[in-house]
């Protein structure tokens, strides 16, 4: 508790930007996954607005790279019909239309900007607020919105969506790394961004070109192993052998350690990653909650302790249950990526043992959302319902 009091006192005396940036490194890293997709339509300015209102430390998001070289905030390799709707072609007779179902790498920014990605509530997230007509944003547009919405030095955990198994479905790691460097340099935001990727080659290239940029090695038990002969990634109990397509040519079984947890951490350390971001639950698990029989955690205390001994932090994804939150606290993780940042924030406040980032100014944030959020011509009322 004393550390929280000291941190609050210091921030109350001085609010200069460098100090705020230091403070954000001291907060428990509460990350809103895709902004907080359990609460608001994912990877959109509305989701990031509510992430700020809920007091996240870090806005987590994903990037696609369009055919004409624009970074779009979006998770999927293609335009998912459960999340977006077509509103019309850019020009009459466009052979790529309809755009829904097409891959981001094959679409231009103009084509992507016709999509309504704010009207559809996902079945798996029935409490999502929708903002009808919302367009996808570029990385630059997202930074501009956040700059308007808060003076806090909120952090960004940004994934480059590179497909390690099927390289023709996305732009290359080289293309992504070049593109993010141009935008991060333009905004001089290096010390607030973590570059995360399942495709570790992107992280290797990132460290070579931008050594000041933090990198996070994403993985689950389908990406740390070589594909099975049937093309699937497998899991902890059934998988291929040899170098994984996702780990920049590394074979985790060649690294020292009695357990998979130790070996994968050492593999991440070998590419100079600053942190690891494993799936909370293993693909081999037959249950979704630690309280249930058959639950298998991919992240465990051995993994956390090994990472910390090598100077790496551990921030797992995607924890959406209170029992998972408690499990992760118990094994000593440094942050949690969740679809429900409001619920995690409530639990952290109740525990009272972790310093937390400030909650956002609702009026200011919503004013900036009204200014920056772009809508298709078929937009609804824009109020979130």
Walk through the language-model features, giving the residues of each.
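Phosphate-group recognition and catalysis centered on beta-loop-alpha active-site segments
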Residues: 2-5, 12-385
